[in-house]
Amino acid sequence: MKILTINTHSLQEENYEQKLCWLVESILKERPDIIAMQEVNQTADAPLMAPELLAGQYPVPGALPVRQDNHAANVAIRLWQAGVACYWAWVPIKLGYGKYDEGVAILSLGRPIRSTDVFPISKVHDYQNWRTRAVLGVQVEGH
């Protein structure tokens, strides 16, 4: 199994759209089975993502709605557009920089996600506190 882990910084990055394209190109070239991302964010007050664009999403119970600029969703959309089945889950952990729902995501290329588990790894469990940390786990089909 090929696994890619990446700290994306997502929307905080300069030239975000260009870096998003580079990331997707790299994924298409390397074809990891699983992609684990941290610092995956969306603007907290951005419009909601249209449901028809959420192909492959495994909604994590209790998670916030996915917004139009959600980084994991936008990676998944581009992979689907390139003909790669991308199943994904995202969970927000904290409010970053006072404006981003920031969390972690796991993408699975070709294998649907069957279940998720989220558990805290910090003593702080306050969504407004930047020190809050948690882990997202997934079970994919066939494993």
Predicted regions and their residues:
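N-terminal, active-site-proximal structural segment of metallo-dependent hydrolase catalytic domains
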Residues: M1-Y100
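Active-site catalytic loop in hydrolytic enzyme cores
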Residues: G110-G142
